[in-house]
Amino acid sequence: MKPASVIIMDEHPIVRMSIEVLLGKNSNIQVVLKTDDSRTAIEYLRTYPVDLVILDIELPGTDGFTLLKRIKSIQEHTRILFLSSKSEAFYAGRAIRAGANGFVSKRKDLNDIY
């Protein structure tokens, strides 16, 4: 079985690295890109199919909600998991209404992603 391809988008390099290490424990998951740059991610998505994007709400030059719309316009079946330090209740609801498949608070254990 082909591993699930994952893009990690977060403004903090340490968060990107931590998620990659955590996901790297599972041989059925392959992190194909780690970035905080929306243009880099969009270029990648235009070229390669991606199963999941782990997406922060706050990114340099854009926000996760705007980027979610762009991602879905390129790859409608790509799943989106929001990861944010924002207030869980308000932003979780907004994320799901915007089309995300899930929401994880950074204030919780990152093992919730795994």
Segments (PLM) and residue ranges:
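Active-site residues of response regulator receiver
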Residues: 56, 84
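Short amphipathic alpha-helix used as the core "switch/output" element in two-component signaling
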Residues: 43, 65-76
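Acidic, metal-coordinating helix/loop segments flanking the phosphotransfer/catalytic sites
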Residues: 34-52
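C-terminal output helix
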Residues: 90, 108-114
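Residue-level signal for the "D+5" position in two-component response regulator receiver
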Residues: 34, 59-62
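Acidic catalytic/metal-coordinating carboxylates
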Residues: 37, 63-66
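Conserved acidic segment of CheY-like receiver
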Residues: 2-15, 19-23
